[in-house]
Amino acid sequence: MESQIQIKLFATLQPFAPELGEAYPISPGISIRSLLEQLNIPQEKAKLIFIDGIKANLTSTLNGGERVGIFPPVGGG
C-alpha cells in the first residue's frame, strides 16, 4: 500500500525535488536513507533532516502523512 509524505528540500537540495511537488508517494516503513536514494540525493548532502519538526537520522522510518524537511550542510565565510 502506498502513502504520501510532504517533502521540502532547502537551498542547494532544491534541484533534487520531486517533479510532483511537495507531495511524494512512499511505501510505509521506508527509511530516510532509502528516501534519499530514491531522490538521488547523496547522503553527505543531507546534513539536517526533520520529520514533523523533530530531528531525524538516516535510520528513521516514515509511514505516511509526515512532513519531511532536508537541509544541506551550511557554509559561510
Go through each PLM region and give its residues.
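Ubiquitin-like/PB1-type beta-grasp interaction modules and other compact soluble beta-rich domains
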Residues: 1-76
